[in-house]
Structure formats: C-alpha cells, structure tokens
Amino acid sequence: MKKVNLNEIKEDPWQSAGGKYVVSFKGISEALGREPASLDLSKRHPFDLEWSRMPAGKCNFPYHAHSAQWELYLVISGKGTVRHKDGRTEVVAGDAFIFGPNEPHQLINSGDEDLTYYVIADNPIGEAGYYPDSGKWKVNKSSAADRVVIKGEETDYFDGEE
C-alpha cells in the first residue's frame, strides 16, 4: 500500500500569460508513484487524482473538450460555474459532475473565495484536445504539459500525401 497526506504534497501554481486562467494543483497520483510519461500502465495508474485550487474570478483553462479522456470532478469548497455544451451550471461544495470525451467544458470561480475541487481523469495515451472558442487543437506528446498546439484549416485526408 502507498499512502500520502494532501498536506504534504507541494502545491504547483499555473497561470496563463494574461492571468485570465489561474489554478494550482497537487498531484496526488504522482505523489503515490504515478509516472505520467510511462507507457507501462502499471506505472501510469488507471486514473489520475488531482487536488485543484482556483482564485475568485478566474477560470481553470480555456473552454475545451478531450478526444478520449474522462474527467470526474468533486467540489470541496467554494462556488463555481461550469460552462458546458448546454449552457452554464452553478456548483457548490459536495457537487460532483463528469465529462466524457468530446464534451467541452470549463470551470469558472464565480464565488468570493477560492474554489477547491478534486479531479479524477483516466489520462489516456495519445490524448488530444479541441478548443471550440479559438478553433485550436492540442496534441499531447509525453504529458499534458509537453504538448503541441495547432490551428489550421480543414483539409482532405490525402492532402500532401500523394
């Protein structure tokens, strides 16, 4: 058995250059030995558990959808708004919600205090993401942080191949 305490895990801050997107993470699964870059599923773990904290008035990430990944959220404290394909839904402590592949989503801290939540994701190898607001695609290489972001036009499958 492996055990960690959330209070002993380093909090890693992240924010966009313009400061609209701000969130901090505690990688619980990584603290338990998960190796995100490994192709060995016994080292990757079948899912990833992360604690997140977002300041008031901020968003976690741009509105996006995953090609293959599932994400399950559990709100610990604070108040937020979840943007999704059917509109917006308010969430508070105790609320759980899930997004499957190709379901665009975004979390916004609409309260006056930090919004904290857990995220459980399956983080499949070869994951890609789509950003409907900007028309961009993100393709992960070895991890979500090691990525390529592209913006292009639709083309024929065999364009440039024959």
PLM feature spans:
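Structural motif
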Residues: 72, 79-81, 88, 104, ...
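Conserved short histidine dyad/triad with adjacent acidic residue
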Residues: 30-37, 50-66, 101
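Short, conserved beta-strand element in jelly-roll/cupin
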Residues: 46, 51-55, 65-84, 121-124
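Short, charged, solvent-exposed linker or helix-capping segments at domain edges/interfaces
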Residues: 128-133
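Ligand-binding loop in jelly-roll beta-barrel domains
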Residues: 101-127
